[in-house]
Every structure is written in C-alpha cells, then in structure tokens.
C-alpha cells in the first residue's frame, strides 16, 4: 500500500533549481518516495520498442549477457569484409535533454578482440572524449582490460599513442593521439580519456569527486566541440554509466532552463539501454549528486584572481561582501560535512583504545585510519593510533593527520612512521607542558622508543623551524626474545635465518629515513601564524625533501600533526593541495580542497581564521613564484565570457 501511494507521488513537472535541494531533503526523510519513482520508471519501459534480438545472437561479443543494446538505438559499425558480424558492438546511443545521440554507453573491454572493436568505434563515431567509470582491477577481479597503451600500440588499422597522463587522487586523465590511413592519406585525431578511479564495487564514490569529474569532462567538451557523442562506459555499461548521464544531462538542462527533471530523464535512460537505472540506491545517489551540485555551485578561480580577492578586503564595502561570501561558504561546508558516527569509528571507541585519544570526539573512522603492525602483542589492540588518512590533490592518503603523542602512545607514533614508511613529519605545534605533551624526539645520538632505535643523523635550527633527520631501525630479537647485538646479527648463520618462521624469531634489517620538521613561528595562543612567510618556508622544505628522499617518497605519506590533531593541520594540507592544483591546473579551489579534507576528519579548518588565512597563504605562494605569471595572460583571456569566479557566482546563487 505504501509503495502504491509512493508511486502516485512522482513529480509531474520539472523542478526549479531554487526548490530542488528542498525537494531532495524532503524525499530523503521518506525514502519510500525514491522507491516509488524507481518503480514507476521501470514500468515506463516500452517492451515493443526495447528489443535485443540482434545482441542476443552475439554471445561472444557480450561479456555481460544481461546488458544488451536495444536494436533501435544500438551503435552500428561499418561491416568488415572478413567478418560478417563486425557491424555489432555492445553500445547504445542515448539522448540528453538538449541533444540527440549525445552519449554512447558501452561495456568495458574484456577481451583482445574487443580492444580492436572499441577503438574502431571511437574512430567511426568521431568522438574525442571517453569517460571510464570503473577500475581495471577491483577486489582482485578484472573489471576492464587496459585497452590503452602505455606508450604506443596499433589496434587493427588504428595507431593509438598515449601523449600524456595526469594522475589525481580520484581520477586519471590521459590524452591519446589516434592515427589511421584513409583514402585521403594519414588522418590524426586527439582523444581525451577521463578515468574515474574512485568508484569501488558495492559502494558509491565521494559526491564531490564525482561532480569534479563531470565538471572536467564538460569543460573539455565545451572547449573542444565536435559533432560526436561522449563515450561512457563502466564495467557492464549499466548503472554507473546511467548515473553519469543523468547528472550531466540534468545539469545541462539547469544551465539552460534553470530546472531539473530527474524522473523524466530516468525514463529516457531505461528506454535507451537496460539497467541504466538499476537500483533505488543508485537513483537516490543521482538526486544527492545533483542536490550538492545545485547547492554548491562554487567554481575554481584563476591564479591571478587571488590578488583581486585579497584586495577586496581592504575597502569597507567590498570587505562586507567578502565576509558575506565567507559566511555563505562556511554554511555550505557545515551543511555538506557529514558527521562521523560512533559506528564509523568503532576502533577508537573500544575500551582498550579510549586512553589513546586526547579527545573522544576526535576519533578516526575505521576505513581511513592507518593500521599498525609492529607492536603485535604489545597491547590488546596494537593496531590503533589516533591518526587518519587524508587525500591530497594527486594521490589518495597522501597525508596522515595525527595528534601530539601521549606518554603511552610515543611507541605507537614511531610505529606509524616505520610501518607506513613515512618520509616526512611536519609538527605544527610548539611543545607545551611536558606533562601533557611529552618529548618524542631527541636532538642528537640514539634513543630507544619501544621496539625502535632512532638515530639523529642531522639536526638544524632555522628561523621558522627545526629539522631532525633521523634513521629509524627496528630492534632485532633472538628466539628467546633477547636483543641481538648488531655485530653478531651481521654474522647470523643462513640456517638460523631459514628457521626464522619456525622459531618466531624476528630479523629486520630495513631502516627508515625520515625528516621531522618542527614549526617555530606559530605561537600556541594564535589561531594562525604571525605571517605567511614562515609557513611558506616550512612547506618549501617539506616539498623539497619529498623530491630528494630515498625509497620513492612520492608514494609514501606525510605525517602532519598538531597538539590536538585538528587545528593547524588543515591549513598545511589545504595549502599543499592548492599548490599542486596551481602547478598542474593553473587554478585554485580552496572551498573544494577544504570540503574533501573534511571527509575523514570533519573538524579540519576553522572557518573564521584558518579559511581566510589559507587564501592569504596561496596569494603569497603565487606572488613569490614568478613561473605562474606565464599562465596569467592565457587564463585572463579564456576567462572572458566563461564561467564566473567563485565569489560572484555563489553570491548570485544566494
């Protein structure tokens, strides 16, 4: 009965963008309303129109037999003389709100013959944009073959060359050059590949990352227009692809008409290809993505606009405008930051771990905390430390945020460095009362911390910081649990090493080299540093060491810590994210950097002081790095007539 009532409550007209967030909020309270829409969508399938007679006879060309293209809108390739079935590929045309055949949805490449067919389809369609919504491997299962070359390869009569690759935390963007011999000679085309790596099996991705992917795709398509569809695929060419199409088509509709119509477009999807809307959860996810996109229409700004933004605080009228803007962004961040539930942080709330937390309200979620291994058997839960992984701009879990260790957790702190091969520790707090903030590193010589021997190789004092270059070595124990002297360990017999497993004997020769940077220019009573210069020097030193450190530091995390693991660390991580964005994309997006940082630690960044300081920090970085100036002219020219800046856009939206 409830389902029947819900099915009668489906929307009958497009929804104004100004009312869309409230509409989704109301439906979120009564989830059965989403189910009602979903059931009505499936009832709308025209069985006379949606037939799969051709695809059902091509079993070897369909890795997923339950997702076949409908006959009326399938992609038909030119037939090859050597293969009578070469006209067939598991791909379907799908209309958007504004354009027919705006997309082609296809399945993942699963065999080598499909590899050739895929690139032939890309060429015949004339597409210059491919969106990939699946990983190559997911949970030890091959989801899609790597159908692109690392450098260059020929598929059939099409030569594909990978020109460049840009890796980000949640996606990888590649540029391909396709070359083919035609009757008119050699023809060359450029194709952009947007690979979303965030969407794992049986889960949904971060909404912010999904919106950013769509923004990048749309930005590229608008700058490089061709009369050809966007090719979209996941593993089976169904639900994930449908979600991307629904979001993109409705945001394009909103851009033109100021309205969204998820329900009617979902009916278009299910009549275009099977399972493009494949569950109530996926359907609700589409609504959630669109609601956040509508509510949070704040775009990156060009680097040269940082100076304009900073100068607006000087005049009273403009300062009030900017303060209003900051307040608006603060409210958005508070609304969009999902609080962590106790169940999300079960490890930190266990009885044996409560004493390891300085604040029971600041506990890491289990899915994003770094687990320890070395202290096996030392305590009931030896894996726990109050630390959390935070994504950077180019890599997931690029940073580990933690608090100043307690007397009882100093061993765990060094275990964190050793077990996760951390090459850099940035401590943003000065030592307070030693009773509460014990010394965890010495200035010279060797010292023991639990199972580790830490040797200070170099110690330097600078105006803004001190730095300890340390070598972290794990102690070696014999079969009776006694430390082995280093000299006798070096002469250990091969037979003893071979019997190690049987005797539970610990033998460890690997060491870690780590740079511990201690900030000196951030007084304990100050919310932000006295200036931007000192913190810039700290960031430069840490980034310089990361480039020089041994053992592939680009793949190892940086530990960022403060007295409570909340204040200060957001400024440092946010600055690094924005610097990488400036280096790679020549734009700045402080708002979304903060939003992504808060996913695993919602308390990061104090909006009153740290948020504005982060903008000041980025302006200082921009002004002191002349190499950014070469992009200013191009950015300013491309900006005219294009998207509005962050502040002007969001103020209009209010």
Task: Put a short name on every predicted segment.
Residues 1-654:
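Cys-based phosphatases of the PTP/DUSP/CDC25 superfamily and their flanking regulatory architecture
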